[in-house]
């Protein structure tokens, strides 16, 4: 499904842990790393596509995550000319993406890169929040920067709430007498 401007509707997924680190996934058989992402099927909402892609690419279900935020607007990037398939109609010149920030609520061991018949990724790791902006392929860098700027506040709030829970000692128990 390509829009009138030549962009394929797509969702991007940033998964964070309670420490504010983000999941960084290695593309299958490549030395290229990125966030999970994928196309939106006809009749599917961005949120439905996000949950489908979440399972297909990393084996997680709705119960395994909590949605912290989504981008206000669609974000676009153009593909380099060498990656455009000029022989397909309509021609796709890039992606327009709706991004979601998710908090991992399950155990890391529940992550399964092999959940679909054709895996997108063959490995993953936790990285610092801003690391992906510097490391992603150059034509996606501006979108990643915008996504991470938009999502920083919910991540800071998450880190602060975790720190507050750790720093707050339990209330003393009263003696019954």
UniProtKB/Swiss-Prot annotation:
Hydrolase keyword on record: yes
Biological process annotations from GO? mRNA catabolic process
Domain named Nudix hydrolase is located at 6-149
Question: Mind telling me which CDD domains this protein's record contains?
Answer: NUDIX_Ap4A_hydrolase_plant_like
The family database entries (Pfam families) matched by this protein are listed as: NUDIX (PF00293)
The domain of life is Bacteria
Q: Give the residue interval(s) assigned to the motif Nudix box.
A: 38-59
Keyword annotations for this protein, in alphabetical order, are: Hydrolase
> Which cofactors does the annotated protein need, by name?
a divalent metal cation
A GO CC term assigned to this protein in UniProt? cytoplasm
> Which molecular-function annotations from GO does this UniProt entry contain?
mRNA 5'-diphosphatase activity
Describe the task this protein carries out.
Accelerates the degradation of transcripts by removing pyrophosphate from the 5'-end of triphosphorylated RNA, leading to a more labile monophosphorylated state that can stimulate subsequent ribonuclease cleavage.
Q: What is this protein called?
A: RNA pyrophosphohydrolase
Q: What is the source species?
A: Pectobacterium atrosepticum (strain SCRI 1043 / ATCC BAA-672) (Erwinia carotovora subsp. atroseptica)
């Amino acid at each position: 499904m390509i829009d009138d401007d030549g962009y394929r509707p797509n969702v991007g997924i940033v998964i964070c842990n309670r420490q504010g680190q983000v999941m960084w996934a290695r593309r299958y058989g490549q030395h290229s790393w990125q966030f999970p992402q994928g196309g939106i099927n006809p009749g599917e909402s961005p949120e439905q596509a996000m949950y489908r892609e979440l399972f297909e690419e990393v084996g997680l279900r709705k119960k395994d995550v909590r949605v912290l935020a989504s981008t206000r607007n669609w974000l676009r990037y153009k593909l380099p000319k060498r990656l455009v398939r000029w022989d397909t109609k309509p021609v796709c010149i890039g992606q327009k993406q709706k991004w979601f920030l998710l908090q991992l609520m399950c155990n890391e061991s529940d992550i399964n890169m092999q959940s679909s018949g054709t895996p997108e990724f063959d490995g993953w790791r936790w990285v610092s929040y801003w690391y992906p902006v510097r490391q992603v392929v150059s034509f996606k860098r501006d979108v990643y920067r915008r996504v991470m700027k938009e999502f920083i506040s919910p991540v800071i709030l998450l880190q602060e709430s975790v720190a507050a829970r750790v720093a707050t000692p339990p209330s003393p128990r009263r003696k019954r007498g």
